[in-house]
Amino acid sequence: MTNNYINSPLDQFIINNLLEINSPFLNLSTLNFSTFSLYTLFVVLVISLTFILSIGGESNNLVKGSNWLIAIEAIFDTILNMVKGQIGGSVYGRYVPLVYTLFTFILVANLIGMVPYNFALSASLIYIIGISVSLWIGLTILGLFLNKAVFFSLFVPSGTPLPLVPVLVLIELLSYTARAISLGLRLAANTLSGHLLMSILGNLVKNLMSINYFTFIFGLIPLAGIFAIVILEFAIACIQAYVFAILTSSYLKDSIYLH
């Protein structure tokens, strides 16, 4: 009998405790070091190493810089132009670091999750929705700080007839609150579905190719399709990080300008 590394397509999303901290006096279960913590730390280390390589590259030319530095500057310039186009005005620059950090973190987490048998951080609903809810709370506080009570005019579209105000306020409030969930849910759903698709198709092709020589040769056709899906998933990993950054910039604009 053949032993599989993964018995179920969902096994790759299970959070396992790697180091447990127990105390007879205090509940320290939340301080356990799990795969969740390990991969979060790994993502941060990869981002830090990337910046170190960009600074200490082979080239000492201060104008040209290393290849790592050129790549990072290209990404930063893309995010800068995107935030400038979304927010505009003279205040957009102060929010570029936030959007760039979110984009970089999600991009690296998505790419690390593409490695076979890895834990996908962005496929964890609790993790990603936790980020989106925290971001939504922060943007709401920012809107209240900048606009005071005028912030609540965001829930009343201009020109609304007085009898329709209660209904529209409820609709706008629900729409605004849904951002806290939809921002992270979109990313997690795309990542989860992509990983499940690759895992299920990979197991099916493996079982097909292990029957006999004929099915092994025939299985090369769907195997090529799986390689195409993997390439597509890499593209989706980059696109989803960019979409998250765009939506964050759009929500920032609403908090600043109330429209």
Swiss-Prot record:
It comes from the Eukaryota. Residues 1-7 form a propeptide. It is found in: Mitochondrion inner membrane. The keyword Lipid metabolism does not apply. Its main location: mitochondrion. Disulfide bonds: none annotated. GO terms for molecular function: proton-transporting ATP synthase activity, rotational mechanism. SUPFAM superfamilies: F1F0 ATP synthase subunit A. PROSITE patterns: ATPASE_A. It is a multi-pass membrane protein. Pfam families: ATP-synt_A. GO terms for cellular component: mitochondrial inner membrane; proton-transporting ATP synthase complex. F-type ATP synthases have 2 components, the catalytic core F(1) and the membrane-embedded component F(0), linked together by a central stalk and a peripheral stalk. The central stalk, also called rotor shaft, is often seen as part of F(1). The peripheral stalk is seen as part of F(0). F(0) contains the membrane channel next to the rotor. F-type ATP synthases form dimers but each monomer functions independently in ATP generation. Mitochondrial membrane ATP synthase (F(1)F(0) ATP synthase or Complex V) produces ATP from ADP in the presence of a proton gradient across the membrane which is generated by electron transport complexes of the respiratory chain. F-type ATP synthases consist of two structural domains, F(1) - containing the extramembraneous catalytic core, and F(0) - containing the membrane proton channel, linked together by a central stalk and a peripheral stalk. Belongs to the ATPase A chain family. This is ATP synthase subunit a. It comes from Pichia angusta (Yeast).
